C-alpha cells in the first residue's frame, strides 16, 4: 500500500483536505514538505480501516531537510489520495517516531 500511495503522490494524484491546510499553517509544516515526504522513503505505522470518513493510514516519513513527519492519508484505492493531516511527531510520545509510547 505504501508504494501505491507514493506512486499516486509522485504523479500528482492527491489532494489536501481543508483540515490539513489549516493544520499545516498552525503547525508550521510547509505544503512542499508534505509532498516531498509522502513521495520519499515513507512507512505506514498505523492503519485506520474503520475511520469515520473512510479507510486511512498514518505514514511516517522524513523530509529532504531531515524533518520527521506523520501524514494521515486515505487508502490509495480512491482516484485521488486525500491528505487528511500532517504534523511533526513529538519525540516524547513516539519511539523512533514510529511506535506510540
Which residues does each PLM region occupy?
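Ribonuclease/tRNase effector modules and their secretory precursors
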Residues: 1-101
Amino acid at each position: 500500500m505504501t508504494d501505491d500511495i507514493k506512486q499516486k503522490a509522485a504523479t500528482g494524484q492527491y489532494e489536501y483536505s481543508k483540515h490539513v491546510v489549516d493544520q499545516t499553517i498552525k503547525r508550521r509544516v510547509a505544503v512542499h514538505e508534505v509532498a516531498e515526504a509522502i513521495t520519499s522513503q515513507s512507512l505506514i505505522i498505523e492503519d485506520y480501516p474503520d475511520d469515520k470518513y473512510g479507510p486511512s493510514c498514518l505514514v511516517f516519513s522524513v523530509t529532504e531537510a531531515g524533518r520527521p513527519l506523520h501524514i494521515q492519508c486515505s487508502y490509495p484505492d480512491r482516484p485521488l489520495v486525500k491528505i487528511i493531516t500532517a504534523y511533526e511527531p513529538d519525540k516524547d510520545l513516539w519511539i523512533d517516531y514510529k511506535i506510540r509510547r
